[in-house]
Amino acid sequence: MIHLDTVTKRYGRAYAVQDVTLTAAAEATTVLIGPSGSGKSTLLRLMIGLTRPDAGTVTVDGRRLTTSTAQALRQRMGYVIQEGGLFPHLTGRANAAVMAHHLGWPHDRIDARIEELVRLVQLDPDRLSQYPNELSGGQRQRVSLMRALMLDPDVLLLDEPLGALDPMIRADLQDDLRDIFRRLGKTVVFVTHDIGEAAFFGDRVVLLREGQIEQTGPMASLLDAPASPFVTDFIQAQRAPLEHLRTEDRE
């Protein structure tokens, strides 16, 4: 579980996050959604300790995330970003195992974990000998997911992991990701700007606006009982193009 208590983060005079209190529950997927600049990625970086709050506290399973505890707590978290963040000079296998090598795992332990993970993420084992520029976008994200899961973390954080993929690859990986989340039963925090992804993955959805929480709850509550005109407009803005196309088809 991750808990943020009245967390604020500023860059200069601008607030990226302001007075946010939020809990990402264990064995559930919390989706952070909102327009660009609403604070989604900043919140994720605060949760993993890559940036420090100017005010408020972040705790992971009851332990406060500070400069002195960040490294140890970060080993209990896996992190996936939009483009994968793989090292271009390393093979897929070496990328997946980079943290295990850093911690001095023996080769047989690494081999066994790689074998487990390649089955879990449904990646062709032959792809592990290739470099990132030889892999498709979906394959790179599967390797990135292997790396995030290598140490069997308690928490998995994903920052728009599907955003750069073409629609067919995205659909396949989306199905596989949800299956993985359900099977592993970890605390998952998933960032997206897409309400379809939020509905697909989220046990709980947190809609952000200018660094603050506008509404939170199951996706159905945002759709059926929007808390403000902003919530209505945000949802309608993503529905409108599809409705426009349906109207044209009927005509």
Can you describe what each PLM-predicted range is?
Residues I48:
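Helix-to-loop junction immediately C-terminal to a conserved catalytic motif
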Residues R64-G78, H102, D108, L222-P226:
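ABC ATPase NBD coupling module
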Residues H101, D108-D126, D179:
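Conserved ABC ATPase "signature" region
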Residues Y131-L135, Q139:
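Conserved ABC ATPase signature
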Residues D152:
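Conserved catalytic motifs of ABC-family nucleotide-binding domains
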Residues E210-Q212:
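Conserved ABC ATPase "signature" C-loop
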Residues T216-G217, A225:
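ABC ATPase "signature
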